C-alpha cells in the first residue's frame, strides 16, 4: 500500500489523512517524498508571526491562496477544502507548518484552532480518498 516502484515510502508509518508533530521527520525529506509521490508540498514557516492575522497571512502567501483570502479560520478552511476541490482532481497533499508561534496574540487556544482547521481538512480529503498529511512544530 505504501510502496512505490519497489521503494519503501518515508511515510509508511504515517496515516494518509493525519495532523501530527513533525518529530524526527526533516522538511527536506518530506518535500522529496511529496515530489516522489506526485503530491502537492505546502510549506509555511510561521516563526516570524505574532498574531492570528500574521499566521494566516503567512500561510496564505506560502500556499498561494487567492488575493481575496480573508485572514480568518473559516477562510482558511474554505481554501484548504472546497476551493481546492473545485479546481479539479488532486493527487494528495503533504503540508508542513513549521514553528507555529506561542505569543500573547496567538496563544495555545489559537494554535489548537489552527490545527483543528487542518484536521477538518484532512477529514474532508480522507472522505474523497485523497491523502492530506500535515506535520507541524511549535516555537
What are the language-model segments listed below?
Residues 2-139:
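Positively charged, polar, low-complexity stretches
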